[in-house]
């Protein structure tokens, strides 16, 4: 019976050996830097393909019709179909194909019959009777703010408000494309304002804490917050510059009237009051955000300069304290030197009288006091910091 049991165990041994061999290979691959780099590249490629699929050449998007209804939610459109159907250039879809959450550089590209908008995390193709919102149901437009944006976008495209009263005319006179662009700007500025409030609250709290005590952790938090404010300021500044460039180009503003171009009534070069007023309104909002962030960064910079002055002053005080201790030790060493000479086991004819000890002690004290006073006097001269000496000031006169 024992022999039979041993035979029944023998076939299981190769399975255990295979398992341990496989585990060893996996452990060896994970410890290999080249294998880890390959895994990282595959992961990044998989993430980048969430929006743009290079094999199928499709881009995920949501289409709104002329009535503001969501016609096709989260569909995949071919890249070449988008280019040929809507009169785009291949380079126009580069920003759309990126999978980053926030694109730092905003842009508004005006084409023959469409407007391609890329602001913060919103990328859309606006036409006179259609709006294509890229990646609307993907990883980026799944938050509460983006859901609110889609709801507000539908209301504006349908040309009605959320508090519309029956039997009362409450229509927006702006054309379809301007209502879509306005909704995108409103969502972008709302996101900027929300992010600004967070940065202001955090920065104000750190600055108030630094008024009571300066610690290493608080300085580290201040540095991190300053970096975040710099990125946010750059993002807001680029958005303001983009709107300002649009306002300076009269031909581009006239080309943004897609509905009138479709009706065969193109605008004159200087006849763009509606879109100009619309852009100026949001330019003022963005400019206010930029100025607020700039003032906060200026306050942080001023606080950093004051902290550096305080730390430099404390460091100088510590250095002066160390110098005073060194001066005291030097003076004491001078008196000890006199005493050591007196205490040598040599004939010096001073020991024969009774005045030797008082004389040596007096000389040691006098030497110690002289060295201390002389060193402290020169130290006080070094403490007095002047912009220019009397001789230089007299020559400058």
UniProtKB/Swiss-Prot annotation:
CDD domains, alphabetized: Mrs2_Mfm1p-like
Stretch forming the transit peptide: 1-48
Subcellular location: Mitochondrion inner membrane
InterPro entries reported for this sequence: MRS2-like
Residues annotated as transmembrane: 318-338, 355-375
Membership in a protein family: Belongs to the CorA metal ion transporter (MIT) (TC 1.A.35) family.
An annotated Gene Ontology molecular function: magnesium ion transmembrane transporter activity
Function: Mitochondrial inner membrane magnesium transporter required for mitochondrial magnesium homeostasis. Modulates the conductance of the MRS2 channel. Involved in the splicing of mRNA group II introns in mitochondria by affecting mitochondrial magnesium concentrations, which are critical for group II intron splicing.
UniProt keyword list: Ion transport, Magnesium, Membrane, Mitochondrion, Mitochondrion inner membrane, Transit peptide, Transmembrane, Transmembrane helix, Transport
Protein source organism: Kluyveromyces lactis (strain ATCC 8585 / CBS 2359 / DSM 70799 / NBRC 1267 / NRRL Y-1140 / WM37)
Domain of life, source organism: Eukaryota
Membrane topology: Multi-pass membrane protein
Statement: the UniProt record of this protein carries the keyword Acetylation: no
Residue ranges of the motif YGMN: 342-345
Pfam families (alphabetical): MRS2-like (PF22099)
Subunit comment: Forms homooligomers. Interacts with MRS2.
UniProt name for this protein: Mitochondrial inner membrane magnesium transporter LPE10
GO biological process: mitochondrial magnesium ion transmembrane transport
Gene Ontology cellular component list: mitochondrial inner membrane
């Amino acid at each position: 019976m024992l022999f039979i049991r041993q035979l029944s165990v023998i076939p299981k041994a190769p399975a255990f050996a295979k398992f341990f061999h496989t585990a060893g290979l996996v452990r060896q691959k994970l410890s290999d830097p080249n294998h880890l780099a390959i895994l990282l590249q595959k992961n990044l490629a998989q993430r980048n393909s969430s929006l743009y699929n290079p094999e199928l050449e499709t881009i995920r998007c949501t289409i709104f019709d002329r009535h503001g209804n969501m016609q096709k939610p989260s569909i995949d459109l071919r890249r070449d179909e988008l280019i040929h159907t809507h009169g785009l250039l291949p380079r126009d879809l580069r920003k759309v194909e990126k999978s980053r959450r926030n694109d730092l550089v905003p842009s508004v590209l005006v084409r023959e019959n469409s407007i391609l908008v890329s602001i913060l995390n919103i990328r859309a193709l606006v036409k006179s009777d259609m709006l294509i919102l890229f990646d609307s149901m993907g990883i980026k437009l799944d938050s509460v703010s983006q859901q609110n944006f889609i709801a507000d976008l539908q209301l504006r495209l349908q040309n009605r408000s959320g508090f519309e009263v029956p039997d009362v005319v409450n229509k927006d006179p702006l054309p379809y494309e301007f209502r879509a662009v306005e909704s995108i700007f409103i969502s972008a500025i709302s996101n900027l304002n929300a992010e600004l409030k967070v940065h202001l609250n955090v920065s104000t709290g750190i600055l108030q804490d630094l008024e009571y005590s300066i610690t290493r952790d608080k300085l580290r938090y201040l540095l991190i917050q300053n970096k975040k404010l710099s990125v946010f300021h750059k993002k807001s500044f680029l958005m303001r510059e983009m709107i300002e460039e649009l306002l300076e180009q009269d031909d581009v503003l006239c080309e943004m009237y897609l509905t009138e171009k479709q009706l065969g009534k193109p605008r004159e070069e200087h006849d763009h009051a509606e879109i100009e007023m619309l852009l100026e309104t949001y330019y003022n909002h963005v400019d206010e955000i930029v100025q607020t962030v700039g003032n906060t960064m200026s306050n942080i910079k001023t606080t950093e300069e004051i902290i550096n002055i305080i730390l430099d002053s404390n460091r100088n005080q510590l250095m002066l304290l160390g110098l005073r201790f060194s001066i005291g030790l030097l003076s004491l060493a001078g008196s000890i030197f006199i005493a050591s000479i007196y205490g040598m086991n040599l004939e010096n004819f001073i020991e024969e009288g009774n005045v030797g000890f008082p004389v040596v002690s007096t000389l040691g004290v006098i030497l110690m006091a002289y060295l201390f006073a002389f060193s402290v006097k020169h130290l006080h001269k070094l403490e007095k910091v002047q912009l220019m000496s009397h001789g230089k000031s007299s020559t400058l006169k």
